[in-house]
Structure formats: structure tokens, C-alpha cells
């Protein structure tokens, strides 16, 4: 009978230690997840900006990087010089 009480006490102590260490580890992991979530939402809102405000061309065309403004419309994005 005394052995089962000791086993229960040891298990209870082990559970208590695990719960205390999990409480100190989890906040840093949740902080990292919230940082990633804010980066994702910032990227999503940046994708909703109007075309007139975007100066950078599509990355599908690696030759063109920025509009050169040679057509007197600096934000048209049709002609570029690298």
C-alpha cells in the first residue's frame, strides 16, 4: 500500500514539473507564431494596394526591375531600363 502511495506521489510530482516547464516553453513558441501571422497579414494587405501606387514590376520578367519613366509616366511600368 505504501508503494502505491509513493508511486502516486512521484507521478503527481512529475506531472507538476512537466506542467511548469511547458508553461515556460509555450509562450515563446506562441510569440513566434503570432509574429509569423502578423507578417502574413502585412503581406496580404500589401497585395491589396492599388496598381498606381506600385512601382515595382512583376518578378516574372527578370530583366525589368523598375519603371524608368522614359514615357513621361513614372508609374506606368511599361518600359524599363536596367
Swiss-Prot record:
It is found in: Secreted. GO terms for cellular component: extracellular space. Residues 24-53 form a propeptide. Pfam families: Hepcidin (PF06446). GO terms for biological process: defense response to bacterium; intracellular iron ion homeostasis; multicellular organismal-level iron ion homeostasis; negative regulation of intestinal absorption; negative regulation of iron export across plasma membrane; negative regulation of iron ion transmembrane transport; positive regulation of proteasomal ubiquitin-dependent protein catabolic process; response to iron ion. The keyword Signal applies. Disulfide bonds join 64-80, 67-70, 68-76, 71-79. InterPro entries: Hepcidin. It comes from the Eukaryota. Keywords: Antibiotic, Antimicrobial, Cleavage on pair of basic residues, Disulfide bond, Hormone, Secreted, Signal. GO terms for molecular function: hormone activity; transporter regulator activity. Residues 1-23 form the signal peptide. Liver-produced hormone that constitutes the main circulating regulator of iron absorption and distribution across tissues. Acts by promoting endocytosis and degradation of ferroportin/SLC40A1, leading to the retention of iron in iron-exporting cells and decreased flow of iron into plasma. Controls the major flows of iron into plasma: absorption of dietary iron in the intestine, recycling of iron by macrophages, which phagocytose old erythrocytes and other cells, and mobilization of stored iron from hepatocytes. Interacts with SLC40A1; this interaction promotes SLC40A1 rapid ubiquitination. Belongs to the hepcidin family. This is Hepcidin. It comes from Sus scrofa. The lineage of its organism: Eukaryota, Metazoa, Chordata, Craniata, Vertebrata.
Amino acid at each position: 500500500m505504501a508503494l502505491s502511495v509513493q508511486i502516486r506521489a512521484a507521478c503527481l510530482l512529475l506531472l507538476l514539473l512537466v506542467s511548469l516547464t511547458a508553461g515556460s516553453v509555450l509562450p515563446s513558441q506562441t510569440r513566434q507564431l503570432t509574429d509569423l501571422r502578423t507578417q502574413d497579414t502585412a503581406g496580404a494587405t500589401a497585395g491589396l494596394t492599388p496598381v498606381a501606387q506600385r512601382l515595382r514590376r512583376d518578378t516574372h520578367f527578370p530583366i525589368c526591375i523598375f519603371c524608368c519613366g522614359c514615357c513621361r509616366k513614372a508609374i506606368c511600368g511599361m518600359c524599363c531600363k536596367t
